[in-house]
Amino acid sequence: MVYVSWSAAALLCASFFSTVVLAQSAKDLYGTWSAKSNQVFTGPGFYNPADELLIEPSLPGISYSFTEDGFFEMATYRVSGNPRNLACPSAVMTFQHGKYEILANGTLILRPFEVDGRQLVSEPCVDKGVSTYLRYSQVETFQRFAVELDEYHGKHALHLFQFDGSPVQPLYLAYRPPLMLPTITLNPTDHAGATATAGPGHRKRSLGELVRAGLQDKHKTTAVRNPSLFNAAFYWWCSAGVIAAGTVLFFMV
């Protein structure tokens, strides 16, 4: 039987709770985080503010970036299947950036610059190849968040929990410092309700006008891709060597 002293148990509990507390700070959020697909990142590779172009990633995913002084950026590319017609999936690309706030209870609130958000909605079997491009502004509230070291993936993971407590898919640290566009209003207008074009309401543009595959017009950045903390191949070969050595010693004894 293994006995654990009260002091050791208290130390473990203190370590656990200190991790949770430390996770609720701007320092822990700092960087660019991306979903498991590792294909969607914030920054100029997703949205070109000069031409107001959303650039389609190779796979769906989500990405958030945070600075230590209260700015954020969001890039999402979601694809939904059509149960009635599998050949007619819908896709939505969304860009937002602005300021964030961490409340005393750990709640994370993202408040975008209203005039800068963009969204592209594509329903090829409905819109006949002409996607809808419009301004987008939506405040996001996360009940809480936590940052931890995911030993399986060898990366730091960001866990976000929506306002109702339901978890968002884990995001993994990809760049630090973050890969972001300038943290200012990129497309100022006279009023927040103005559209991306000169005409009233939102205008429909062809998909080819608005989405450019690949990473185009990528500006210079100081962001550095965050490598995995562990080399899977190295540890695999080390494990294999230990097993082999153990087998030899077993038969020699």
Curated annotation (Swiss-Prot):
Keyword Transmembrane helix (UniProt): yes
Glycosylation sites: 105
GO BP terms in the entry: 'de novo' protein folding; budding cell apical bud growth
Stretches that traverse the bilayer: 233-253
Lumenal topological segments: 24-232
Primary site of residence: endoplasmic reticulum
GO molecular function ontology, one term from the record: unfolded protein binding
GO cellular component: endoplasmic reticulum membrane
Name listed for the protein in its UniProt record: Protein ROT1
Gene it is expressed from: ROT1
